[in-house]
């Protein structure tokens, strides 16, 4: 049964409030209409395209990070629940890859995962004490890396965080990070 335009637009707004990362293609399949119809519906409802929705979510999350200044975060944090989970997005550009092969330099994938692990800890003073990482496939220029971090345990001044990075649902990087955080009774280093 076909949904009327006004009802579809209302449902579209509700759906994107719950999941702002849905593509026009996914929305088209969800509602059983053309991509052009979805784009017209978005325009009529003043709903920005995916890239702008991602930037908006990232902007709203920037003040939640305690240990890093916004410019110190590698990738765009799009979801953050301190001490629970976090998600960031990193678009691989020509400046991130080896010139001859077009393959992303590993330290960029590590930086995305590491800054996500630091951001997840609810403390002003957080350092990576140990990291065990694995690259599972090369990432190429133009690909979007979505890193998901979750807290796996906490104790004795250390927090264990697991990070998995994907490109189009395919795992490209995994890491287990032991994060050190200074407790309130320790003296802070002088700046």
Swiss-Prot record:
UniProt entry tagged with the keyword DNA-binding: yes
Matching InterPro entries: HotDog_dom_sf (IPR029069), Thioestr_dom (IPR006683), Transcription_factor_FapR (IPR017275), WH-like_DNA-bd_sf (IPR036388)
GO biological process: fatty acid biosynthetic process; negative regulation of DNA-templated transcription; negative regulation of fatty acid biosynthetic process
Keywords for the protein's UniProt record, in alphabetical order: DNA-binding, Fatty acid biosynthesis, Fatty acid metabolism, Lipid biosynthesis, Lipid metabolism, Repressor, Transcription, Transcription regulation
CDD domains: hot_dog
Domain named MaoC-like: residues: 102-169
Entry's Gene Ontology molecular function annotations: DNA binding; DNA-binding transcription factor activity
Role: Transcriptional factor involved in regulation of membrane lipid biosynthesis by repressing genes involved in fatty acid and phospholipid metabolism.
Family: Belongs to the FapR family.
Protein name: Transcription factor FapR
Source organism of this protein record: Shouchella clausii (strain KSM-K16) (Alkalihalobacillus clausii)
Gene transcribed to yield this protein: fapR
